[in-house]
Design a protein with these regions (language model features):
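Domain-level recognition of nuclease-like catalytic cores that cleave nucleotide substrates
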Residues: 353-375
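Active-site-adjacent loop/helix micro-motif of nuclease/hydrolase catalytic cores
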Residues: 30, 326-336
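Interdomain motor-coupling "hinge/lid" segment immediately C-terminal to the ATP-binding subdomain
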Residues: 50, 56-191
Length: 375
């Protein structure tokens, strides 16, 4: 504190009242180590913010060859809060949608009755906007100021560029090009018919052993989420997940779209989501589920049977199909018909629909995905 007052003339530290905020904590690992002493001292509250704090190797950044020893993390002396981009509900609040409207949507879901047309159309429009804008605070703020998608896109591309800069700045030298190659391959991975993450898509001849750590770095940085294939459609889901068979989704839909072809935003706002083999739809639902704290799973068999997502809903395993059109859900129907094999009794179809039911399949509009809590 003495040094801080020397560096900030006029600053007054009042025990029990002063809160010290340390931004960009990753730039100075020693500052994080100092939290132990602030906690022990007890006179001042300290809030720290920063990116990449979850990345393996934090505190071992090497600027010189002789700087090999990392700094210690003050275990037990800090409370960690993971901050995510705005989820869809928060985006609704920012756009003036009241809690009463959201409660009404909950009731429509609970009673399985259609949402009135005026509200339904408004929610559809807002969801399309959320797909394009995403939840990064600066992007949302820019959108709310003038609704200029061009300006929003520039903000998003700046953020993506900052991600790439961080990869160069904080990763080990040997990993830097591989991390960037992994990151830049994500749109190509999702544009494939089979969206399973394939290392050969990064670079011809690439092997998993070369890129496993690079992909983990991007995930630890909070940029992507993995969606694991299940060996069987039974609970517990995590116990049936294949660690080496997975899809990768961007954790912010707006940033994902900013990495795609120019004009994609206009297509989405006009309701045209057929491009990229349904990846835009899948990514936004993965985005929504991830921000709810859900782990992501899907089901794929070599026979061609595939379901976009599986989750625990109302205490049981539930299939979730995401449709860019009012298409067929052949795999879901096959699984539901063969309960003795797959042990599944319910499914949800998300798409450009209103609320409805067809036997064991609950049909919902895309914008209701955020209401699908586990119980």
């Amino acid at each position: 504190v003495m040094y801080l007052t020397a560096m900030i003339p006029g600053a007054t530290f009042v025990p029990g009242e002063t809160c010290l905020i340390l931004d960009e904590l990753q730039e100075c690992p020693e500052a994080r180590t100092a939290l132990k002493f602030f906690k022990t001292d007890g006179r001042y509250d300290v809030i720290c913010t920063g990116s990449l704090l979850g990345v393996s190797g934090y505190g071992t950044k090497k600027k010189k060859k002789d700087q090999k020893k990392g700094t210690s993390v003050p275990v037990g002396y800090e409370t960690i809060v993971d901050m995510n981009p705005l989820d869809f509900e928060e985006f609704l609040w920012a756009n003036g949608i009241t809690p009463e409207i959201i409660d009404f949507l909950h009731e429509c879901l609970k009673k399985e009755v259609p949402v009135p047309e005026a509200i339904h159309n408004r929610m559809n429009d807002l969801f399309l906007q959320y797909i394009v804008v995403g939840g990064m605070p600066e992007a949302v703020g820019t959108f709310l100021q003038n609704h200029d998608i061009g300006q929003v896109l520039q903000v998003q591309r700046n953020i993506v560029d900052e991600y790439k800069d961080d990869m160069v700045k904080y990763a080990d030298d040997a990993d830097k090009p591989k991390i960037r190659e992994c990151f830049e391959s994500i749109p190509r991975q999702l544009a494939k018919e089979n969206k399973k993450f394939q290392y050969a898509t990064i670079r011809k001849g690439a092997r998993s052993s070369e890129y496993l750590g690079s992909l983990q770095w991007i995930e630890d940085a909070g940029i992507i989420s993995r969606c694991y294939n299940l060996t069987q459609t039974e609970l517990p889901l995590d116990g049936n997940a294949e660690d080496d068979v997975f899809k990768v989704y961007m954790r912010d839909s707006g940033l994902f779209l900013s990495m795609l072809e120019q004009g994609t935003q206009s297509d989405v706002l006009q309701g045209n989501l057929l491009g990229y083999k349904g990846s835009i739809f899948e990514n936004i639902i993965a985005d929504v589920f991830s921000k709810m704290g859900r782990d992501l799973y899907y089901y794929h068999k070599e026979s061609g049977l595939e379901v976009d997502f599986l989750m625990r809903y109302k205490g049981q395993i539930t299939l979730v199909e995401v449709k860019s059109t009012t298409g067929n859900i052949k795999s879901t129907k096959t699984i539901l018909k063969n309960k003795n094999v797959y042990h599944v009794n319910s499914a949800i179809k998300l798409g450009r629909y209103n609320v409805g039911r067809d036997g064991e399949t609950l049909t919902l509009p895309l914008y209701m995905a955020f209401l699908l809590t586990a119980y």
